[in-house]
């Protein structure tokens, strides 16, 4: 009933914009909720957008809106079916390639894994934070896990305008960083 994303994900823009789609059942829950909405009120946003001259709830970051528009143009040009297929193929390559390097996959089942990001447990004896720094020195950016996974997990993104040659280069840098 709620779908939420942000500009830096598959839309290929800088961070700073969030997008939410609210379904009918979710609207009913919002309207029934007794909790105060001091920071984010979907009701206030809806009424603002319904005006003859719609307004955003704050200052519009025009440069980010233009980035998102360009990302959407690129996605439309490639075709969503092809984009989804490309992301699934890259996800599978990252997973098979990293398993061969001794990494484990987080998420027990296929339905728990995203086609746009792979979360991995690092091999025994490898500190995720130090490993991320070594990978970065090879020109590739990966992220460490969050909270309790910070020292034992890395995250590899394969979304947006990433291609299979980028995935292969990432795997090569990750392999080199293990030695």
What are the residue ranges of the model-derived segments?
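Conserved active-site segment immediately N-terminal to the catalytic lysine
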Residues: 1-8
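Small/polar glycine-rich anion-binding or flexible loop at a beta-alpha turn
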Residues: 91, 111-117, 147-155
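Active-site C-terminal subdomain of aminotransferase-like
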Residues: 11-96, 100
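A short linear hydrophobic-aromatic micro-motif
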Residues: 103-107, 140-145
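Conserved PLP-binding catalytic core of the aspartate aminotransferase-like
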Residues: 104-135
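Short amphipathic alpha-helices in soluble, non-transmembrane regions
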Residues: 130-138, 170-174
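PLP-dependent enzyme catalytic core of the Aspartate aminotransferase-like
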Residues: 148, 152-179
